[in-house]
Regions:
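C-terminal flanking helix
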Residues: 58-65
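Short amphipathic alpha helix immediately N-terminal
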Residues: 20-31
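Short amphipathic alpha-helical boundary/capping segments
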Residues: 9-18
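Short alpha-helical "recognition helix" segments of helix-turn-helix
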Residues: 38-40
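Key DNA-contact positions within bacterial/archaeal DNA-binding proteins
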Residues: 47-48
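Residues within the DNA-recognition helix of helix-turn-helix
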Residues: 53-56
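Intrinsically disordered, low-complexity basic tails/linkers immediately adjacent to helix-turn-helix/homeobox/MYB/SANT
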Residues: 67-93
Length: 118
């Protein structure tokens, strides 16, 4: 399951780098949880053909992540925001101050997304 989640995250960031066929097969595998046999039947190719396309596409996504690191960076930023929020969750604040604090954190997350394009 972890592998499929990671593949889905990589697809969300780097999908435009794949061919249309790779996209289709990887999405069926990662998002729809289809078996190789199900994908082969849908696509009209052999199970081995699906495996080859799946492996080539996944390798390209992993190589791109190793070079660019968007998924890794986003995970670090999310962890830092979560840690910051948890550290201050028990600090007594008035409701309006708590709302402002949460708003600033959401804005910060949005800035990171805008800068990274994710």
């Amino acid at each position: 399951m972890e592998r499929l989640f990671e593949l889905g995250m990589l697809l969300d960031r780097y999908e435009p780098l794949l061919t249309e066929r790779q996209r289709s097969i990887l999405r069926q595998y990662a998002d729809e949880n289809c078996s190789l046999s199900e994908i082969a039947e849908r696509e009209g190719i052999s199970r081995q053909g699906v495996r080859d396309i799946l492996n080539r596409g996944a390798n390209l996504l992993h190589e791109t992540e190793a070079a660019v690191g968007l998924v890794r960076k986003e995970a670090r930023q999310t962890a830092k925001l979560r840690a910051f929020r948890n550290r201050f969750k028990d600090v007594p604040l008035r409701d309006e101050d708590r709302a402002a604090f949460e708003g600033y954190l959401a804005e910060l997350a949005g800035i990171w997304e805008d800068e990274d394009g994710v």
